[in-house]
């Protein structure tokens, strides 16, 4: 296999962008494991008392990820996130203002392999979220297990990540002052198995939990489409029904996370590696769908609102797909 090496002479700014994405990839794929190893080493070293003190802190702080987390505007505004967003680049586009007196549930589509667009747009200020949506506080939902990892939990909470359990959503959407925006990758980990360049298959037809949540709390729904999200990595062919796909689906049910076999590019070559390819991501935030508070919604009400959400998502796709390199005759695939 021929390896396509990067040229030696490229602008220094591009080097900085690559370094920014490299640190993100390492932290996303290996930081949790390193933090666990560090804690164990600390526990069995002469500094064991520090591990013990942190263990006490962890016990006392256990519920924080389900109570709004502990965001840090300083961390969200690090210059590294500006270079991170410029690498692809990632662009956040607002199609309608969102009144901060309401709470919102933003349905993010598609999940992609590593949810790059959601992280860049809602966990950092690299694309100017606070400027585009003044008064709103974004919270990207993440699997609860990651918030049990020592040290790592502090880092991810600083970027506005919160636990995806029900109590976490209930806490944020119950804030009467408004201005809370929950960002949910609706397709979840299973959708990562369909993340392939040029394809856009969304697992949405049977996803109604976020709809019920919106009705229960009267949170307005906002469809969000991230064009280009699936183009960042190549994935081993895994059609539904194949041995590989069946194995991946079984492991996902057991582990709670998807295990797509993917590759991108390297630091000094473009042929293979764990860095995402430099391909643009355009994250389009649609118009809000007003939702009246219904503490005990019926199945009919849930189905009706779900159908409206799907229709608005299709409309968003149809309106914008031609602007971002998608053939106008290509339809959105929902399953």
UniProtKB/Swiss-Prot annotation:
Pfam families in the cross-refs: DAGAT
EC number: 2.3.1.20, 2.3.1.22
Paired cysteines (S-S): none
Pathway(s) where this gene product acts: Glycerolipid metabolism; triacylglycerol biosynthesis
Gene Ontology CC terms: endoplasmic reticulum membrane; perinuclear endoplasmic reticulum membrane
InterPro entries recorded: DAGAT
Alphabetized UniProt keyword annotations: Acyltransferase, Cytoplasm, Endoplasmic reticulum, Glycerol metabolism, Glycoprotein, Lipid biosynthesis, Lipid metabolism, Membrane, Transferase, Transmembrane, Transmembrane helix
Regions crossing the membrane: 24-44, 104-124
Top enzyme category: transferase
GO biological process: glycerol metabolic process; monoacylglycerol biosynthetic process; triglyceride biosynthetic process
Reaction(s) this enzyme catalyzes, per UniProt: a 2-acylglycerol + an acyl-CoA = a 1,2-diacylglycerol + CoA; a 2-acylglycerol + an acyl-CoA = a 1,2-diacyl-sn-glycerol + CoA; a 2-acylglycerol + an acyl-CoA = a 2,3-diacyl-sn-glycerol + CoA; a 1-acylglycerol + an acyl-CoA = a 1,2-diacylglycerol + CoA
Membrane topology: Multi-pass membrane protein
GO molecular function: 2-acylglycerol O-acyltransferase activity; diacylglycerol O-acyltransferase activity
Primary location recorded for the protein, binned into one broad class: endoplasmic reticulum
Subcellular location, record wording: Endoplasmic reticulum membrane; Cytoplasm, Perinuclear region
Record keyword Glycoprotein present: yes
Glycan attachment residues as annotated in the record: 206
UniProt record similarity statement: Belongs to the diacylglycerol acyltransferase family.
Main function: Catalyzes the formation of diacylglycerol from 2-monoacylglycerol and fatty acyl-CoA. Involved in glycerolipid synthesis and lipid metabolism. Catalyzes the formation of diacylglycerol, the precursor of triacylglycerol, by transferring the acyl chain of a fatty acyl-CoA to a monoacylglycerol. Plays a central role in absorption of dietary fat in the small intestine by catalyzing the resynthesis of triacylglycerol in enterocytes. Has a preference toward monoacylglycerols containing unsaturated fatty acids in an order of C18:3 > C18:2 > C18:1 > C18:0 at sn-2.
Protein name as annotated: 2-acylglycerol O-acyltransferase 2-B
Species annotation: Xenopus laevis (African clawed frog)
Gene symbol of the encoding locus: mogat2-b
């Amino acid at each position: 296999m021929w390896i396509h090496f990067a040229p030696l002479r490229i602008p220094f700014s591009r080097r900085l962008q690559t370094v920014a994405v490299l640190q993100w990839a390492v932290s996303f794929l290996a930081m949790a494991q390193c933090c666990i190893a560090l804690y164990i080493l600390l526990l069995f070293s002469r500094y064991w008392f520090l591990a013990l003190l942190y263990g006490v802190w962890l016990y006392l702080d256990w519920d924080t990820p389900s109570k709004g987390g502990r965001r840090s505007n300083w961390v969200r505004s690090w210059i590294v996130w500006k270079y991170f967003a410029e690498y692809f680049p990632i662009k956040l586009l607002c199609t309608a203002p969102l009144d901060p007196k309401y709470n919102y549930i933003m349905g993010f589509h598609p999940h992609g392999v590593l949810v790059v667009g959601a992280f860049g747009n809602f966990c950092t200020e690299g694309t100017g979220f606070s400027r585009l949506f003044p008064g709103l506080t974004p919270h990207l939902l993440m699997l609860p297990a990651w918030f049990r990892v020592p040290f790592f939990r502090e880092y991810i909470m600083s970027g506005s990540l919160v636990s995806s359990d029900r109590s976490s959503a209930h806490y944020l959407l119950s804030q009467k002052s408004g201005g809370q925006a929950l960002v949910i990758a609706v397709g979840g980990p299973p959708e990562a198995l369909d993340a392939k360049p040029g394809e856009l298959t969304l697992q949405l037809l049977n996803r109604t939990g976020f709809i019920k949540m919106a009705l229960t709390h009267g949170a307005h729904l906002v469809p969000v489409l991230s064009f280009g999200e699936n183009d960042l990595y190549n994935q081993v062919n895994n059609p539904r029904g194949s041995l590989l796909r069946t194995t991946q689906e079984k492991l996902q049910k057991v582990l709670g996370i998807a295990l797509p076999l993917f590759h991108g590019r390297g630091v000094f070559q473009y042929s293979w590696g764990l860095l995402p390819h430099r391909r643009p991501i355009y994250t389009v935030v649609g118009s809000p769908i007003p939702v009246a508070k219904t503490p005990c919604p019926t199945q009919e009400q849930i189905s009706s609102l779900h159908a409206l959400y799907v229709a608005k998502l299709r409309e968003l796709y149809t309106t914008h797909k031609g602007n971002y390199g998608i053939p106008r005759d290509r339809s959105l695939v929902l399953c």
